[in-house]
Structure formats: structure tokens, C-alpha cells
Amino acid sequence: MADSRRVIIASWYRTFMGIVNLFGLETKTCWNVTRIEPLNEVQSCEGLRDPACFYVGVIFILNGLMMGLFFIYGTYLSGTELGGLITVLCFFFNHGEATCVMWTPPLRESFSYPFLVLQMYVLTLILRTSSNDRRPFIALCLSNVAFMLPWQFAQFILFTQIASLFPMYVVGYIEPSKFQKIIYMNMISVTLSFILMFGNSMYLSSYYSSSLLMTWAIILKRNEIQKLGVSKLNCWLIQGSAWWCGTIILKFLTSKILGVSDHICLSDLIAAGILRYTDFDTLKYTCSPEFDFMEKATLLIYTKTLLLPVVMVITCFIFKKTVGDISRVLATNVYLRCCLCRCHAYNGKCQAVYTSSHCESSTLRRCRLEAWLQHA
């Protein structure tokens, strides 16, 4: 999974070497290190001409550019430069918990992380604008590919992203046409990653790919689901249940058909953390504290930097607004189902289709009046 990262950086290294050789620039310094006999002297080098230094340098450059991207992202979300500055400061204050690039720069996630931030910014841009411009969608596809190629766990992060966007689509926060384009771009990015990884079947048998296929199917059957005649809440529950069950079933079916066995399964890591299940692969990951349960010191650090309190306050506001919006939609839907009547012009009469003892007579009278005015 990491070969693509090395291939890309190797191509950049050869391009860089061609440029510095063309201009005769000296970007490498070497010296001999004397060691105690019987060990011989060894040469040690630093500078961008050295492949190892170039590799680490590229990682640090990408993460440096990410700071500028955080500023742009925060400015766009808040509408002011102050918001971008606060975003960067919050990242600095929580730098030790947000990334490990300063300790282990060669890690695959250190290379992918900047592209994830770019992907989130592009996705936010798409969700907040109503333009039909294709360039943001193309940028979303390319940033997805750049994020997935170096890191095998990127698909799980994108899966959680789709799992967050799908309920927003179901309850009506995202336009169906826009959400359909987002799903198409994600499907194209999976296909491109599959091709660029020389046919790695893990991309096609992941939860991410299965969720995309299920989302696409539910979007196509949206009208049929709405014609079932059920309430709004039941319609949401049907789509949500179909998405979850279909994603899990499709994931296991594609794994069986393609004969793919993940070298490390997310369910194994969860079982290792909760049930203390162990094997060679889980021990390889869980020996690191990053994959263990959150320590109490971590919560204390988040509180000292005000990250945890601010996130909790924002989460409460979002939850309150979401519950209020959903309650209003459900209340309106129940009222309409109770009082809706189908009016047709036949001697100026109105035939009630959905009525009950709870319907207001004024609503039925208004329906008859509107029918009479239309066909008078």
C-alpha cells in the first residue's frame, strides 16, 4: 500500500536532481565519521540530494503547507481572517495530539494528512455553494486519490465521512443532485486508486466502497421509497437501516468474491481493545499507546488547551439545532398527512383522502375553497 508514496516521491526526487544538476547547485554535505576499531569509517550526508533527507523534507514541506491550508479553511468557515488565525493557533496548542510528524515523519499518515485537510476543505466548499462548477468536484476526486494512495487506513476515514453525509442527505440538509455528484466523485476516486495500485482488490472490498454502492442504490430508489406511503420518520429509518445492513453485507460478499483477506481488520482492533482478543497483527498495532484506550492525561491536555470544552459547546449547539429542525419537519409531515386532501373539480366538491378525527375543519374548508377558486 505504501509503494505509491515511494514512487511519487522518487519521481519528485529525480525531477529535483535534474534541476539542481542543470544549474550546478550544491545541496548535499558529507563527512566521514570515525568509529572505534575494528569498525571502519562511514560517510554521513545531509541535504536534499540525499534520498533519506529528501524524503523527510517532502513530508515536512507538505505539513508546513498544511498550516496555510488550515488558515484558509478556518477563514472560509468563519468568514474572517481571525477565524483562520484561531484555527492555526488551536492546531499549534494541540500539536502533540493532532499529529506525530515531528517524531516519526516517514509514517504513511504523515504524508496523507495534508491531503485529508485539503479534501475536507473542498468538500465544505461544495456543500456550502450552489454553483454548478465542475472544478470543485474534480478537486474532490483528486484529493481523495492523493489521500488514499499512501495510507491503507484512509478508506476507514472516508467511510466515516460518507456515514456522516448520508444522514444529512436523508433528512434534507444536502440536495439530492449535489450528494449524487459527491458519491460519483468518490466512486471515481476509488476506481483510480484501484488502477494506480495495480489492481489492489482491497479498495473494492472495503467498507468505503460498499457504502458508496449502497448510497448510490438508495439515491436511485429514492422516489420508490417515498411512494411507500409511510411517515417521514419511517422513511428515514428505512433508508438508514438499508444503508447499514447493505454496507456490511456487501462488504463481506465482495471480500468473499474477490478473495480478499485484510492484513489487519478494523473489527479485530476493536475486539482487541474491548475483548482483549490478540493475534500477531493486533499485537503489532496495539503495542503502541496510540491504538490503546484513551488515557486520562489526554483528556486533561484537551481541557487545558480549551479544545474539549469548545468542542462540547459546539456539539451541543449543533445537536440542539438538528433536533429542532428534525422535530419541525416531522411535525409538519404529520400535520399534512392528517389534513391533506385531494381536490378535484366535480360540481365544486372536494374529496378528502387523508383525514382523521384530529384534522381541523378550517383546513378542509380552505382546501375546498382553493379547489373552487381553481376550477370556478
From Swiss-Prot:
Molecular function in Gene Ontology: mannosyltransferase activity
Residue stretches spanning the membrane: 52-72, 107-127, 154-174, 182-202, 233-253, 299-319
EC number(s) stated in the UniProt entry for this protein: 2.4.1.-
Subcellular localization, as worded in the UniProt entry: Membrane
Residues listed as glycosylation sites in the UniProt record: N32
InterPro entries the record matches: Dpy-19/Dpy-19-like (IPR018732)
PANTHER family, per the entry: C-MANNOSYLTRANSFERASE DPY19L2-RELATED, DPY-19-LIKE 1, LIKE (H. SAPIENS)
Record's protein name: Putative C-mannosyltransferase DPY19L2P2
Organism: Homo sapiens (Human)
